[in-house]
Regions:
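Glycine-rich phosphate-binding loops of nucleotide-dependent enzymes
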Residues: 2-288
Length: 288
């Protein structure tokens, strides 16, 4: 658990009560009144959420609830109809997807999007493209600055791969990796952009229990090593309840509950709306 506690009410979903030692706390991301409509119908409606600088936050809800749409809004794949997004206090209005990435937001996708014909390390190096420090002339003429930057980038890529135990697969073709390893590689590539906030869209999809357990350990390792915030969409409740410090529940584009894992697993609104259980039934969210 993080050193601060989140509390919420029905009117201000961004309210926080912090211990005295956390007075210096600042959020890395704030979504305020975020809404988007498609064909006049709301896909996300008045979405309010604050993610702390090193928080692991879960976004859960049934299929079609709008979770991936939220990620698309945060990364500017979609522009919101209303509301705003702050990254480190900076309004992202008018930013492109690339600019938001440079501002510190990286993501993975439900469906793996690797360059499968390229090597593992080349996939990671592509993630570093926005942060290379040489111009076209330097690159074209292969000047010393180019080789110095390329060497530094490769060393950094190998360092990132080693966190996931993938350094020995650096020269392997990405498409030849097992499914779980491809998932890990996609996370490494996102980390290569140097994010402050990492968005993981169903990172455990298709993984077996052993791979899921390893993923949980790796998510903690990423947060602790890089001191970044992680926000994840996931249907595996054991994973969500096991690693998230704060959870928001989305249904029909609206947040219906927020709180700690313990609060969410006991919340009758979540049990009824998300898990399909009547309020009188005793089974909690984690038991699904």
């Amino acid at each position: 658990m993080s050193d601060y506690e989140l509390t919420y009410n029905d009117y201000d979903s961004r309210e926080k009560i912090l211990p005295e030692r956390d007075k210096a706390y600042t959020p890395v991301m704030e979504a305020i009144g975020l809404s988007i409509e498609f064909g006049g119908l709301p896909a996300v409606d008045d979405f309010n959420l604050t993610v702390g600088r090193t928080e692991i936050c879960g976004l859960i809800g049934p299929n079609g609830a709008g979770k991936t749409t939220v990620f698309n809004l945060l990364t500017k794949v979609y522009q919101p109809t209303r509301g705003k997004i702050l990254i480190d206090g900076r309004d992202t209005k008018g930013m492109s997807t690339i600019q938001v990435n440079r501002a510190g937001v990286a993501r993975t996708f439900q469906n793996i999007r690797l360059f499968k014909n390229l090597s593992v390390i080349d996939n990671v190096l592509i993630g570093m493209h926005n942060h290379t420090h040489y111009n076209m002339l330097t690159s074209t003429l292969r000047l010393p600055k180019y080789w110095k930057a390329e060497k530094a980038a490769r060393e950094k890529a190998l360092e990132l791969l080693s966190i996931f135990g993938m350094q020995d697969q650096a020269d392997a073709e990405a498409g030849s990796l097992p499914y779980g390893a491809q998932r890990r590689l996609e996370i490494v590539r996102a980390l290569a952009t140097g994010p402050k906030l990492l968005l993981l869209d169903e990172p455990a999809a298709g993984m077996n229990p052993s791979e899921t357990t390893e993923l949980m350990e790796n998510i903690h390792k990423i947060r602790d090593t890089f001191q970044i915030a992680i926000m994840l969409i996931e249907h595996d409740m054991s994973l969500v309840m096991g690693i998230c410090e704060g959870i928001a529940v989305l249904n029909y584009g609206k947040i219906i509950a927020k709180g700690t894992p313990e609060e969410i697993r006991r919340n009758p609104v979540v049990i009824e709306a998300y898990l399909g259980k009547k309020r009188g039934e005793k089974q909690d969210a984690e038991g699904q």
